A protein has these predicted regions:
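Small-residue-rich hydrophobic transmembrane alpha-helices
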Residues: 1-35, 72-91, 201, 214-278, ...
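Membrane-interface helix-loop junctions in multi-pass transport and translocation proteins
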Residues: 100-147, 284, 293, 336-369, ...
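Transmembrane helical elements of multi-pass membrane transporters/channels
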Residues: 64, 75, 142-146, 150, ...
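Short membrane-interface helical motifs at transmembrane helix boundaries
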Residues: 32-63, 119-121, 269-292, 296
Length: 394
């Protein structure tokens, strides 16, 4: 966000200074997470209530995931910095490529070698047969390849942010203080939301293997519906941030409403499509009839929440672009911990997985209403906009 402000103000030198500080801090932070993750990787599956037959595979997966955290963190940081410079297309293309690489690596690492017949010709498909461990390694390798590409385009090819001779890494107290004020609420929010996801898993785990599998596949299928919202939210962050940096405070609220309305419209359409083709979406992911039936039911429940989910996603991006992160983080915390989790814990023993997703649907609608109310009636995010305006960037 600070990079977008600097570029909007025409201060490319300041943008590069913040970029280098941000990459250094992100790397150090990811190393801390790596240490914590590897330390708890063996016992975490048991804490979450996993059955003994899956705990060993879960340990292997989470261990590889933890070891890959620095790569993932630098990948995310580089992509966000490219987006903040106004280059939305390249990170999106690279993330799509990462998905294809993930599938390709998984195909070779998860399954053993086998023969297939294609047009009367027998082909040998090599494979290592590593199972769950192969899935983790495939994802980590895909992240590594794309991280290298992201860093190359950021540090060598970006018109505004590529490295220049004579510009060394140095930490500025003012930059770090502003970064802490903006990022700490977001970091705490992500930590709390991750904890909430763990608690959700804990609520689903006792419902049995079919419910666990249906829940996992449904989350994967639903991501096709809400990913456009996150893309629009990222674009909104850049637009608002550069408007702030340029001193165009008159544009911030108008762009905020345009982006939020557009996101809601897109996800309303994708939600309607998801409702219609839910059985087919789950069928692609699982051959099990029971998983297909349960997964389709919960996807259709969630489809009704997609427009309001979009409101919270995009409006959050708008607020972040203006430097307003504390109140949105509090709204996310309250809706997740005070609405979704208690309601899911109450409904799960009575309605099973359907109850968990009903709780999710209700919570997302409430969250969307809260974000729309803040966008409409609160002026404090406009004040946050002015606090990070051009006078502070000189």
């Amino acid at each position: 966000m600070q990079i977008a402000h600097r570029i909007g103000a025409g201060d490319d030198v300041g943008a590069r200074r913040i970029m280098k500080q941000g990459l250094a801090v992100a790397l150090l932070y990811s190393l801390v997470l790596l240490s914590i993750g590897t330390g708890i990787s063996r016992t975490l599956p048991e804490w979450l209530g996993g059955e003994s037959r899956i705990c060993q595979d879960a340990f292997h997966y989470f261990l590889i995931y933890s070891l890959a955290l620095p790569v993932m963190q630098m990948n995310l940081a580089a992509g966000a910095m490219l987006q903040s410079s106004g280059n939305m297309r390249l990170p999106s293309i690279l993330h799509v490529l990462m998905c294809f690489l993930d599938m390709l690596f998984n195909m070779f690492l998860i399954f053993p070698g086998h023969n297939i017949r294609l047009a009367g010709i027998t082909l040998l498909i090599p494979g290592m047969g590593l199972g769950v461990l192969g899935a983790a390694l495939g994802t980590a390798l895909a992240q590594l390849v794309i991280m290298i590409c992201m860093m190359y385009f950021l540090l060598a090819r970006s018109p505004a942010l590529h490295l220049r001779k004579g510009e060394k890494l140095c930490f500025h107290r003012k930059d770090l203080k502003r970064a802490v004020c903006i990022s700490v609420p977001v970091a705490v929010e992500q930590f709390i939301m991750s904890g909430a996801q763990i608690m959700s898993t804990r609520i689903v785990a006792p419902l049995g293997m079919i419910a666990i599998a249906a829940n996992s596949f449904s989350i994967t299928a639903e991501s096709l519906c809400y990913m456009p919202g996150y893309g629009i939210g990222s674009a909104a962050t850049t637009l608002i941030g550069q408007s702030v940096g340029a001193g165009r405070h008159d544009l911030t609220k108008r762009l905020g409403w345009i982006a939020t309305g557009f996101g809601m419209a897109v996800m309303a359409v994708s939600g309607a499509v998801m409702y219609l083709i839910a059985p087919w979406m789950i069928a692609v992911l699982s051959p099990d009839v029971a998983i297909r039936a349960l997964g389709a039911q919960v996807l259709r429940i969630e489809a009704f929440a997609e427009p309001m989910y979009a409101a919270s996603i995009v409006a959050s991006g708008v607020f972040r672009g203006a430097g307003d992160t504390l109140i949105p983080s509090c709204l996310n915390f309250c809706s997740m911990w005070l609405v979704r989790l208690p309601l899911a814990a109450f409904l799960a023993p009575r309605l099973g997985l359907r109850g968990v997703w009903i709780a999710m649907c209700i919570e997302l609608c409430i969250r969307g209403v809260l974000f729309l109310m803040r966008l409409a009636f609160s002026k404090s995010w406009d004040k946050a906009d002015k606090r990070h305006g051009t006078k502070q960037l000189t």
